C-alpha cells in the first residue's frame, strides 16, 4: 500500500464514526474527566498497513508451537512444580484479558476523539485474541499434563477460590468505576505499561528454564501487542493533561492504579516465579532483581518520571514502598506462605521446599531462612495425612491473616495493617494506601469536587466470610475441589500422586474454619485493640 493510499484509507476509516443529530446520546460509561482542550493523536495509522497479516502470522506461530510441543514430548520434561502453579495463573489471566477487551468501549465512549477510537477498536481485537490463545494453552495443558485435575475446573474455581477472586478483583478494575480511571490509567498506563514486563517477559523466561516452552511462545505473542496498547494509553493521558482540571484526578488515579497493581500482580507473579521454579542457579535473577530492571528502571524512571515535566505529581513514595515491601519486608514470600497455608482449598498442588530451595532463597534474600525457613520445614513435615491436620490447623507459629478490603490480598506485612470502621463495618487493609483507596478515592467527592462516576468497593470482598463456621471438608465439597473418586482433594501439599499419600475429605474433616473479619466485628473495642496490637506485633493470637 502506497503512502498516499494509506493516508486515504486511514481518513476513510475515521469517517466511519459519527455523532447522532437526531437524539442526545446516552452516556453508558461515565467519566469525571474533561477533554474540551484535548489534542488529537491516532496510534492506528502506524500499523494499519500490516496489522491483520501480522496477527495472523503470530497466531500461526502460537498454534504451530502447540502442535510441536505435543509431538516433541514437552510434557515428559516440564517440571510439575511449575505446571501446578499454572492451574492458578491460567485460570485468572484470561479474565483480565477479556475485561481489557470490554474496557475499550468504555474508553471509546468517554474520549471524544474519533481518531483514537480506531486504535482502541484494534486493541479490543488484540485482547480477545490474547484471551483465546491463553484459553487454548490451558486446554492443551489439561489434555497432556500428568495431573489434569484443577485445569479442568479453572473457570468455575477461579470465581470461588480465595486466591482466584483476588485476580477477579484485579480484572474487574478495568471495567468498573470512572471510565478513564478504569480503562486508561489503571489498565493501560499502569497495568499494561509497567506490570506486563514481569508478567509477559520475565515469567516466560522462568517457564523455559522449567521445560515449558509453550508459555513463552504464547505470552511473547501477547507482549508484542502491548507497545500499541501503551501508545493508546499515553495518547489519552496526554489528552487529559491538556486540561488542568484533570490533574487532581490523574494524580489520584496514578496512586490507586500503581498500588493496586503492585499488591496483586507482584503477589501473584512473584510467587509463581520464585516458588514455582526448580531452577536454582545462583546467577538466575530473583523476582526482586527482575522487578528492579523491568519495573523500577524501565517503567518508573523511563515512563513515569518524565511526566513531571507536565506538572503531574508522580507517586514516588509508593514506588519506593513497593520496592521496600519486595526487598525488605518479604512480600512475595509472605504471599507464597499464605497460599501454601490454604492448600486444602486450592485447585493446584504446592510442592515442598528442599535444601536447594532454602540455599537459593537465603542467597538471594539474606535473612529469608530466619523468617520463613522453619515454617517451610513444618510444611514438609506435615505434607502427608494420617498423623496430623492440615498445616493451617496445626501450631506452627502462624496466624491466619486478615483480608485487605481493597486489593483483597491479605494484610501479610502485619505491622502495616490498618483497621478502620468504614460504612458501618470494621474493615482491615494491608496498607495505608489501600485504606485511602476505599475511604477517599472511591467516593462521590474528591478534594471538594463531585466524582459521581468513581463508584464504590462493594460486594463479598472477604472470601473467608462466605465460609465462616463451616467444617473444612464441607467447604472443599461446596467448592467442588474433589477428584473423580469423590473423596480425594484436588489440592495437595506435595506432588506425590500415590493415592495412599493424598489427602481425602475424611482426612480434613473435623476442622472448623472461621473468618478473621467476622470475629473482628464481634469483638469489643478493648478486645479488638488487643487483637490488632498482637497481630501487628507478629501474628501471635491475643
From Swiss-Prot:
Observed phenotype of the null mutant: Cells lacking this gene are unable to grow on phenol, acetone and methylethylketone (2-butanone).
Name the UniProt record assigns to this protein: Propane 2-monooxygenase, hydroxylase component large subunit
Species classification: Bacteria, Bacillati, Actinomycetota, Actinomycetes, Mycobacteriales
Role, per record: Component of the propane 2-monooxygenase multicomponent enzyme system which is involved in the degradation of propane via the O2-dependent hydroxylation of propane. Also involved in the degradation of acetone via the O2-dependent hydroxylation of acetone. Also able to catalyze the oxidation of phenol, methylethylketone (2-butanone), 1-propanol and 2-propanol.
Record: residues binding Fe cation 2: 127, 192, 226, 229
Signal peptide interval: none
Organism, scientific name: Mycolicibacterium smegmatis (strain ATCC 700084 / mc(2)155)
Catalytic activity from the UniProt record: propane + NADH + O2 + H(+) = propan-2-ol + NAD(+) + H2O; acetone + NADH + O2 + H(+) = hydroxyacetone + NAD(+) + H2O; butan-2-one + NADH + O2 + H(+) = 1-hydroxy-2-butanone + NAD(+) + H2O; phenol + NADH + O2 + H(+) = hydroquinone + NAD(+) + H2O
Alphabetical keyword list: Iron, Metal-binding, Monooxygenase, NAD, Oxidoreductase
Chain residues that bind Fe cation 1: 97, 127, 130, 226
InterPro entries named among the record's database cross-references: Ferritin-like_SF (IPR009078), Phenol_Hydrox (IPR003430), RNR-like (IPR012348)
Cofactor note (record): Binds 2 Fe(2+) ions per subunit.
Cofactor(s) in the UniProt record: Fe(2+)
Family per similarity comment: Belongs to the TmoA/XamoA family.
EC number: 1.14.13.227
Subunit field text: The propane 2-monooxygenase multicomponent enzyme system is composed of an electron transfer component and a monooxygenase component interacting with the effector protein MimD. The electron transfer component is composed of a reductase (MimB), and the monooxygenase component is formed by a large subunit (MimA) and a small subunit (MimC). Requires the presence of the chaperonin-like protein MimG to ensure a productive folding, resulting of a soluble MimA, which leads to the active form of MimABCD.
Induction summary: By acetone. Transcriptionally activated by MimR.
Listed GO MF terms: metal ion binding; monooxygenase activity
Matches recorded under Pfam families: Phenol_Hydrox
Amino acid at each position: 500500500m502506497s503512502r498516499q493510499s494509506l493516508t486515504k484509507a486511514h481518513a476513510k476509516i475515521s469517517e466511519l464514526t459519527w455523532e447522532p443529530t437526531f437524539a442526545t446520546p446516552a452516556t453508558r460509561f461515565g467519566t469525571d474527566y474533561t477533554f474540551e482542550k484535548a489534542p488529537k493523536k491516532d496510534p492506528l495509522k502506524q500499523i494499519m498497513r500490516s496489522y491483520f497479516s501480522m496477527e495472523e502470522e503470530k497466531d500461526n506461530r502460537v498454534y504451530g508451537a502447540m502442535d510441536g510441543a505435543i509431538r516433541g514430548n514437552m510434557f515428559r520434561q516440564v517440571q510439575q512444580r511449575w505446571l501446578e502453579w499454572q492451574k492458578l495463573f491460567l485460570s485468572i489471566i484470561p479474565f483480565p484479558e477479556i475485561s481489557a477487551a470490554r474496557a475499550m468501549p468504555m474508553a471509546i465512549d468517554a474520549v471524544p476523539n474519533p481518531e483514537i477510537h480506531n486504535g482502541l477498536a484494534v486493541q479490543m481485537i488484540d485482547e480477545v485474541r490474547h484471551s483465546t490463545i491463553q484459553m487454548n494453552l490451558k486446554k492443551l495443558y489439561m489434555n497432556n499434563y500428568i495431573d489434569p485435575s484443577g485445569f479442568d475446573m479453572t473457570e468455575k474455581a477461579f470465581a470461588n477460590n480465595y486466591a482466584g477472586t483476588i485476580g477477579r478483583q484485579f480484572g474487574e478494575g478495568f471495567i468498573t468505576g470512572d471510565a478513564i480511571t478504569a480503562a486508561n490509567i489503571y489498565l493501560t498506563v499502569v497495568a499494561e505499561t509497567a506490570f506486563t514486563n514481569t508478567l509477559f517477559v520475565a515469567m516466560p523466561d522462568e517457564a523455559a528454564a522449567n521445560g515449558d516452552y509453550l508459555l513463552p511462545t504464547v505470552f511473547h505473542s501477547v507482549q508484542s501487542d502491548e507497545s500499541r496498547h501503551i501508545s493508546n494509553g499515553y495518547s489519552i493521558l496526554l489528552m487529559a493533561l491538556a486540561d488542568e482540571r484533570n490533574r487532581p484526578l490523574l494524580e489520584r488515579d496514578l496512586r490507586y492504579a500503581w498500588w493496586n497493581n503492585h499488591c496483586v500482580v507482584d503477589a501473584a507473579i512473584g510467587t509463581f516465579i520464585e516458588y514455582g521454579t526448580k531452577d536454582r542457579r545462583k546467577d538466575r535473577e530473583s523476582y526482586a532483581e527482575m522487578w528492579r530492571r523491568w519495573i523500577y528502571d524501565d517503567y518508573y524512571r523511563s515512563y513515569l518520571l518524565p511526566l513531571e515535566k507536565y506538572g503531574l505529581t508522580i507517586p514516588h513514595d509508593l514506588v519506593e514502598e513497593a520496592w521496600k515491601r519486595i526487598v525488605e519486608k518479604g512480600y512475595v514470600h509472605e504471599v507464597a506462605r499464605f497460599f501454601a497455608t490454604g492448600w486444602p482449598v486450592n485447585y493446584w498442588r504446592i510442592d515442598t521446599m528442599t535444601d536447594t530451595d532454602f540455599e537459593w532463597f537465603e542467597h538471594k534474600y539474606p535473612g529469608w531462612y530466619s523468617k520463613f525457613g522453619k515454617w517451610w520445614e513444618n510444611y514438609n513435615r506435615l505434607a502427608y495425612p494420617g498423623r496430623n491436620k492440615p498445616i493451617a490447623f496445626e501450631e506452627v507459629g502462624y496466624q491466619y491473616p486478615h483480608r485487605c478490603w481493597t486489593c483483597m490480598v491479605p494484610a501479610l506485612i502485619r505491622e502495616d495493617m490498618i483497621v478502620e470502621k468504614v460504612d458501618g463495618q470494621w474493615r482491615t487493609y494491608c496498607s495505608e494506601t489501600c485504606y485511602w483507596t476505599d475511604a477517599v478515592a472511591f467516593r462521590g467527592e474528591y478534594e471538594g469536587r463531585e466524582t459521581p462516576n468513581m463508584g464504590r468497593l462493594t460486594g463479598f470482598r472477604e472470601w473467608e466470610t462466605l465460609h465462616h463456621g463451616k467444617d473444612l471438608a464441607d467447604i472443599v465439597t461446596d467448592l467442588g475441589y474433589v477428584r473423580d473418586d469423590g473423596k480425594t482433594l484436588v489440592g495437595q501439599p506435595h506432588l506425590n500422586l500415590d493415592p495412599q499419600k493424598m489427602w481425602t475429605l475424611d482426612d480434613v474433616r473435623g476442622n472448623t474454619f472461621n473468618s478473621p473479619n467476622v470475629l473482628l466485628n464481634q469483638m469489643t473495642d478493648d478486645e479488638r485493640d488487643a487483637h490488632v496490637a498482637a497481630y501487628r506485633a507478629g501474628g501471635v493470637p491475643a
